[in-house]
Regions:
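Short glycine/threonine-rich loop-to-helix capping motif typified by GTGT followed
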Residues: 66-67, 97
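Catalytic active-site module of serine/aspartate enzymes centered on a nucleophile-bearing elbow/loop
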Residues: 81-120
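Short alpha-helix in the alpha/beta-hydrolase fold that links the catalytic acid
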Residues: 53, 67-76
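A structural signal for short secondary-structure junctions
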Residues: 49-52, 76-78, 87-88
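Alpha/beta-hydrolase
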Residues: 1-49, 53
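Short beta-strand/loop motif that positions the catalytic acidic residue
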Residues: 51, 57-59, 63
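Hydrophobic/aromatic beta-strand patches that form the interior of the parallel beta-sheet core
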Residues: 56-58, 84-85
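Alpha-helical elements of Rossmann-like donor-binding domains used by nucleotide-donor carbohydrate transfer enzymes
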Residues: 34-37, 73, 104, 108-111
Length: 120
């Protein structure tokens, strides 16, 4: 559900054992209410269209936690958005994925930052 890379997932499990306070559990009702309030704000006409900051959205159609259809739809409302969408080769945690996916993500992030926030 989170990654296809067993070693990276086991690393995460090891951190949870070492530091149980960093493990996320299910969302609280407050979290759900705040998430819904945020969604309502973003659904307002003009809300996303007003964003001037360049944004890179990374997603996968195989994500079982995030709606990729919504990511793609919202990216079309963002005037300065770029997307990188994976298929079944990637799960939710793209930066903890198998090297092929992770490397593509990092390369795209580097290129995006070089374009929009170049080093002095």
């Amino acid at each position: 559900m989170l990654t296809h890379d067993d070693d990276r997932y086991e690393d995460e499990v090891a951190w949870w054992a070492l530091r149980p306070e960093v493990k996320l559990g299910p969302p609280s009702w407050h979290w759900v209410e705040r998430a819904m309030a945020s969604i309502r704000l973003l659904e307002r006409p003009g809300a996303l269209e007003a964003v001037q900051t360049p944004i890179l959205l990374l997603a996968t159609t195989a994500d079982q936690l995030v709606s990729t259809k919504r990511v793609i739809a919202d990216s079309k409302r963002l005037l300065h958005a770029e997307t990188l969408i994976f298929g079944k080769e990637a799960a939710h945690e793209l930066l903890r994925e198998a090297d092929g996916v992770r490397d593509q993500c990092l390369k795209r992030i580097d290129a995006f930052l070089d374009q929009h926030a170049p080093r002095p």
